[in-house]
Design a protein with these regions (language model features):
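C-terminal outer-membrane beta-barrel translocator/porin domains of Gram-negative envelope proteins
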Residues: 4, 14-19, 23-150
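Solvent-exposed loop/turn segments connecting transmembrane beta-strands
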Residues: 8-9, 42-50, 124-131, 183-186, ...
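Residue-level detector of the transmembrane beta-barrel scaffold of outer-membrane proteins
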Residues: 17, 34-36, 75-79, 135, ...
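Composition- and surface-driven signal marking solvent-exposed, interaction-prone regions
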Residues: 50-53, 71-75, 148-155, 177-181, ...
Length: 223
């Protein structure tokens, strides 16, 4: 679905998250796994939106490839993310008698494009009832670190930086169907430069797709 459609992004509800983290370091994991199940629900109690339910699941896995003569750290990182809004096609009439769909807002729904998933596309480029996205990253941390020797920048305390290559494959669909979600999937490919600045990972991602290219700047790894 084209994200240019008008959606209500104001909501009042609750979110339940079950997070199991078996990695060595949450800030920059090198091995282990992490799973996260999230259920968000809005009962429409404040009449700010119609009721809706959104379910998301994510599995991330990391493999430490060890050091080399020039690499301080090499990591293969994989991520699977999927989302569904089971109330998507149900409707009800609000106080004004207008029929409203029970659909989650963009920031809680099944969206691709932007800072975390399908980074070669604009934010919320694809939006529908269901979505799936696969990501693979190769994270290379060189032993060479020029930042402590650069005036002014050396005050930022940058102990390491990374060069990252990534590939993403995913799509949205009007129902959660394994076959539908794996047809004509969208692809993002690109690279990233990341650095630890005051205990926070800062990243600049550059990605290309069939629709062009995007530059995404944010903090923390995408997963």
């Amino acid at each position: 679905m084209d994200s240019g459609a008008l959606y209500q992004n104001k909501t009042s509800g609750v979110k339940f998250t079950l997070d199991y983290n078996n990695t060595d370091w949450y800030n920059n994991p090198t091995h282990g796994t992490r799973q996260r199940l999230t259920v968000a629900r809005d009962w429409g109690l404040l009449d700010e939106s119609s009721t809706w339910t959104a379910i998301q699941f994510r599995h991330s896995q990391f493999f430490n490839l060890g050091e080399t003569e020039k690499a301080r750290q090499r990591v293969l990182a994989f991520d699977i993310w999927t989302s569904d809004v089971p109330t998507w096609n149900s409707t009800s009439r609000n106080g004004d008698g207008v029929e409203a769909f029970h659909r989650a807002p963009l920031f809680e729904g099944s969206t691709l494009g932007g800072l975390e998933r399908q980074r070669a596309f604009p934010s919320n480029r694809f939006h529908d009832r269901s979505a799936i996205n696969y990501t693979a990253e190769y994270r290379y941390m060189p032993k060479w670190n020029p930042f402590p020797n650069i005036p002014l920048i050396n005050t930022l305390h940058i102990p390491w930086w990374q060069w990252v290559g990534y590939l993403e494959v995913g799509r949205v669909a009007d129902n959660w169907s394994f076959s539908d979600l794996h047809k004509k999937m969208k692809v993002s490919a690109g690279g990233s430069v990341r650095a630890m600045v005051y205990e926070l990972v800062i990243r600049v991602d550059v990605g290309v797709s069939e629709e062009g290219s995007e530059v995404q700047m944010f903090f923390n790894h995408p997963f």
